[in-house]
Protein backbone atom coordinates (compact mmCIF):
# COMPACT_ATOMS: atom_id res chain seq x y z
CA UNK A 1 0.00 0.00 0.00
CA UNK A 2 1.41 3.37 -1.01
CA UNK A 3 1.57 6.30 1.39
CA UNK A 4 -0.88 9.17 1.08
CA UNK A 5 1.91 11.43 -0.11
CA UNK A 6 2.88 9.02 -2.90
CA UNK A 7 -0.75 8.55 -3.97
CA UNK A 8 -1.14 12.32 -4.13
CA UNK A 9 2.04 12.69 -6.17
CA UNK A 10 1.05 9.96 -8.62
CA UNK A 11 -2.39 11.52 -8.91
CA UNK A 12 -0.96 14.93 -9.83
CA UNK A 13 1.48 13.34 -12.31
CA UNK A 14 -1.35 11.49 -14.02
CA UNK A 15 -3.40 14.68 -14.15
CA UNK A 16 -0.54 16.59 -15.76
CA UNK A 17 0.30 13.88 -18.30
CA UNK A 18 -3.30 13.21 -19.34
CA UNK A 19 -3.86 16.97 -19.72
CA UNK A 20 -0.92 17.04 -22.13
CA UNK A 21 -2.38 14.06 -23.99
CA UNK A 22 -5.71 15.86 -24.36
CA UNK A 23 -3.91 18.81 -25.94
CA UNK A 24 -1.49 16.97 -28.20
CA UNK A 25 -1.77 13.19 -28.04
CA UNK A 26 -5.34 11.96 -28.46
CA UNK A 27 -6.25 12.14 -32.14
CA UNK A 28 -9.90 11.08 -31.81
CA UNK A 29 -12.09 13.85 -33.26
CA UNK A 30 -14.83 13.08 -30.75
CA UNK A 31 -12.59 14.25 -27.89
CA UNK A 32 -12.42 17.69 -29.51
CA UNK A 33 -16.23 17.96 -29.76
CA UNK A 34 -16.45 19.70 -26.38
CA UNK A 35 -13.96 21.71 -24.38
CA UNK A 36 -12.42 19.19 -21.97
CA UNK A 37 -10.53 19.81 -18.74
CA UNK A 38 -9.40 17.39 -16.07
CA UNK A 39 -10.82 18.38 -12.70
CA UNK A 40 -9.47 15.57 -10.52
CA UNK A 41 -7.69 12.24 -10.55
CA UNK A 42 -8.49 9.71 -7.84
CA UNK A 43 -5.84 7.00 -7.53
CA UNK A 44 -6.49 3.96 -5.35
CA UNK A 45 -4.23 3.29 -2.38
CA UNK A 46 -2.47 0.41 -4.15
CA UNK A 47 -1.90 2.57 -7.29
CA UNK A 48 -3.75 0.01 -9.44
CA UNK A 49 -6.75 2.13 -10.48
CA UNK A 50 -7.10 5.75 -11.54
CA UNK A 51 -10.43 7.53 -11.93
CA UNK A 52 -9.96 10.60 -14.12
CA UNK A 53 -12.74 13.15 -13.68
CA UNK A 54 -13.29 15.42 -16.67
CA UNK A 55 -15.41 18.50 -17.06
CA UNK A 56 -16.81 18.99 -20.55
CA UNK A 57 -18.17 22.30 -21.77
CA UNK A 58 -20.60 22.08 -24.67
CA UNK A 59 -23.96 20.71 -25.71
CA UNK A 60 -25.27 17.42 -24.35
CA UNK A 61 -24.49 15.78 -27.68
CA UNK A 62 -20.91 17.10 -27.60
CA UNK A 63 -20.53 15.85 -24.03
CA UNK A 64 -21.74 12.37 -24.99
CA UNK A 65 -19.43 12.24 -28.03
CA UNK A 66 -16.48 13.43 -25.98
CA UNK A 67 -17.07 10.79 -23.30
CA UNK A 68 -17.31 8.10 -26.00
CA UNK A 69 -14.02 9.31 -27.47
CA UNK A 70 -12.33 9.34 -24.08
CA UNK A 71 -13.57 5.85 -23.23
CA UNK A 72 -12.30 4.51 -26.55
CA UNK A 73 -8.87 6.06 -25.95
CA UNK A 74 -8.35 4.42 -22.54
CA UNK A 75 -5.83 1.92 -23.92
CA UNK A 76 -3.78 4.66 -25.58
CA UNK A 77 -3.83 6.78 -22.41
CA UNK A 78 -2.74 3.86 -20.24
CA UNK A 79 0.09 2.93 -22.61
CA UNK A 80 1.30 6.54 -22.74
CA UNK A 81 1.16 6.82 -18.95
CA UNK A 82 3.25 3.67 -18.70
CA UNK A 83 5.90 5.26 -20.91
CA UNK A 84 5.85 8.68 -19.25
CA UNK A 85 5.60 7.75 -15.55
CA UNK A 86 7.90 5.29 -13.81
CA UNK A 87 5.65 2.90 -11.91
CA UNK A 88 5.92 -0.81 -11.28
CA UNK A 89 2.46 -1.28 -12.77
CA UNK A 90 0.50 1.27 -14.77
CA UNK A 91 -2.92 1.90 -13.21
CA UNK A 92 -6.15 0.95 -14.95
CA UNK A 93 -7.70 4.18 -16.24
CA UNK A 94 -11.39 5.13 -16.16
CA UNK A 95 -12.79 8.44 -17.41
CA UNK A 96 -15.79 9.82 -15.51
CA UNK A 97 -17.73 13.00 -16.23
CA UNK A 98 -17.47 15.50 -13.39
CA UNK A 99 -20.73 17.40 -13.03
CA UNK A 100 -19.80 19.09 -9.76
CA UNK A 101 -19.10 22.41 -11.52
CA UNK A 102 -22.55 22.39 -13.10
CA UNK A 103 -24.17 21.45 -9.78
CA UNK A 104 -22.27 24.23 -8.04
CA UNK A 105 -23.31 26.74 -10.69
CA UNK A 106 -26.94 25.65 -10.40
CA UNK A 107 -26.78 25.90 -6.58
CA UNK A 108 -25.38 29.43 -6.78
CA UNK A 109 -28.09 30.38 -9.27
CA UNK A 110 -30.80 29.04 -6.94
CA UNK A 111 -29.30 30.88 -3.96
CA UNK A 112 -29.23 34.12 -5.96
CA UNK A 113 -32.88 33.62 -6.91
CA UNK A 114 -33.77 33.05 -3.26
CA UNK A 115 -31.89 36.19 -2.21
CA UNK A 116 -33.67 38.26 -4.89
CA UNK A 117 -37.05 36.89 -3.78
CA UNK A 118 -36.31 37.81 -0.16
CA UNK A 119 -35.31 41.35 -1.16
CA UNK A 120 -38.56 41.77 -3.08
CA UNK A 121 -40.51 40.41 -0.12
CA UNK A 122 -38.73 42.78 2.30
CA UNK A 123 -39.43 45.76 0.01
CA UNK A 124 -43.09 44.78 -0.12
CA UNK A 125 -43.41 44.36 3.67
CA UNK A 126 -41.56 47.57 4.72
CA UNK A 127 -43.96 50.11 3.09
CA UNK A 128 -46.94 48.31 4.64
CA UNK A 129 -45.43 48.69 8.13
CA UNK A 130 -44.92 52.47 7.75
CA UNK A 131 -48.69 53.15 7.67
Swiss-Prot record:
It is found in: Cytoplasm. GO terms for biological process: maturation of SSU-rRNA. Belongs to the RbfA family. GO terms for molecular function: ribosomal small subunit binding. Its main location: cytoplasm. InterPro entries: KH_dom-like_a/b (IPR015946), RbfA (IPR000238), RbfA_dom_sf (IPR023799), Ribosome-bd_factorA_CS (IPR020053). The gene is rbfA. Keywords: Cytoplasm, Ribosome biogenesis. Monomer. Binds 30S ribosomal subunits, but not 50S ribosomal subunits or 70S ribosomes. PANTHER family: RIBOSOME-BINDING FACTOR A, CHLOROPLASTIC-RELATED (PTHR33515:SF1). This is Ribosome-binding factor A. GO terms for cellular component: cytosol. One of several proteins that assist in the late maturation steps of the functional core of the 30S ribosomal subunit. Associates with free 30S ribosomal subunits (but not with 30S subunits that are part of 70S ribosomes or polysomes). Required for efficient processing of 16S rRNA. May interact with the 5'-terminal helix region of 16S rRNA. The lineage of its organism: Bacteria, Bacillati, Cyanobacteriota, Cyanophyceae, Oscillatoriophycideae. It holds the Pfam family RBFA.
Amino acid sequence: MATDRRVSRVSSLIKREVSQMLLHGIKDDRVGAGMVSITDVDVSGDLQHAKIFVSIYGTEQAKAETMEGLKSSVGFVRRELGQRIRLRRTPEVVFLEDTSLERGDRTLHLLNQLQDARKEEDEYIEPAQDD
